[in-house]
């Protein structure tokens, strides 16, 4: 008698199955908001790619809801872990993205504040960095800071190190 009870406890309840299906629909809806270049990097089936491309065409509420449910159905066949890992890297609302963003801001501040000594450590982490170009951007940012000008060059430094980080992570 205990064997039948143990078998029953391993099955998912109807409520649990519904929660999982709704989670897949929510993930599918998040995918509809991603840009095409990011979608291309995700391991998705062709049917799901087509469904995601069609999603903006469905503007009526009922049609959109049905289409999101269809996307949720197609999501059952996907590698959800791989999709979530990539979304966490590029979605600005996730903790991982924010941590990486703040780390890059700290690098920018160190590079502008410390100059060449910080540049050596940065180049060790990012060997693809163009030292000469980065050194020029840093000097320009230091000059702007010394003369109380708007931080346009500091933004360029940040943009460049963010591009290097994305290249190293395989996002570009």
Swiss-Prot record:
The protein's role, per its UniProt record:
Member of a network of 50S ribosomal subunit biogenesis factors which assembles along the 30S-50S interface, preventing incorrect 23S rRNA structures from forming. Promotes peptidyl transferase center (PTC) maturation.
Domain of life of the organism encoding this protein? Bacteria
Looking up NCBIfam families in the UniProt record yields:
PRK05255.1-1
The SS bond pairs are none
Kindly provide the name given to this protein in its UniProt entry.
Dual-action ribosomal maturation protein DarP
Q: Which gene encodes it?
A: darP
Q: Which GO terms describe its molecular function?
A: ribosome binding; rRNA binding
PANTHER family, sorted:
UPF0307 PROTEIN YJGA
What CDD domains does UniProt report for this protein, alphabetically?
Answer: YjgA-like
Organism expressing this protein natively: Ectopseudomonas mendocina (strain ymp) (Pseudomonas mendocina)
Keywords attached to this Swiss-Prot or TrEMBL record, sorted alphabetically, are: Cytoplasm, Ribosome biogenesis, RNA-binding, rRNA-binding
The record's annotation in InterPro entries points to:
DarP, DarP_sf
Cellular component (GO) terms are: cytosol
GO BP term, example: assembly of large subunit precursor of preribosome
**Family statement drawn from the similarity comment of this UniProt entry:** Belongs to the DarP family.
Keyword RNA-binding attributed: yes
Task: Give the location in the cell.
Answer: Cytoplasm
